[in-house]
Amino acid sequence: KSKFISKFNEIKQKVKLEDGESVSIEIIEDDVCFCLSQGLVKKSCGGNGCNINDNDYATTAKELGIEKEVLMAIASQESKHASFKAVKQATILFERHKMYRLLIKKGNTKASVDALSKKYPSIVNEDSGGHNDMTSYEKLKIAKSIDYDCAIQSCSWGKFQVMGFHYANLYSSPRELEKAMNMCELQQFKYFVLYLKKTNGMVNALKSKNWEEIATLYNGPKWKEKNPEYANNIKRYYNQFKASK
């Protein structure tokens, strides 16, 4: 309780309000354990996060009626096993075209978003791409200064690279998603599993090992233009995992 009050007072001192003005401040404590609150573990991680183990893959695969190697293959394709870029910094990919669409969806006029696109073409853009001009975290920092929540939703997160705009599947806000993804590999897995369950046709594609359908559902109908080997890569990783049993 004392930590919470101290944190609140620290933030409150940084927020200056005019008379009659109010503000909503979201405080997510540093030592929160999302997995404990969701019933995934029996003991708090103390804010250090939990790792995925083979049993997590096996249990989820059984629940979905699929082979665990299919899940592992997707992880290998999406992030090459790298859940984190650094300590408490999830692997991300910032998508500038998602930022563009989310800003308009939020109610900004097309003219205002186009003006942002002209000023920050690598951050806000109608077209996808632009992944090599600066790092995703450099882009995210600038995007947050434009609109924090839209910025978080414009990234794919963690080991399985699920987009942030699916945050409501498991979290109360984009900021809570960011906290969970940066903290915990098991949260990245849980977020991924809920995405699979809520994506129409995905579980059936996983069951039948329809690699091209998986690629379409995971990356959109134009996946062959961006990564023509995506489906073959998943199949190859799957075969490697099966052979290593």
Per-range role (PLM):
Residues K1-K245:
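Cell-wall glycan-active module
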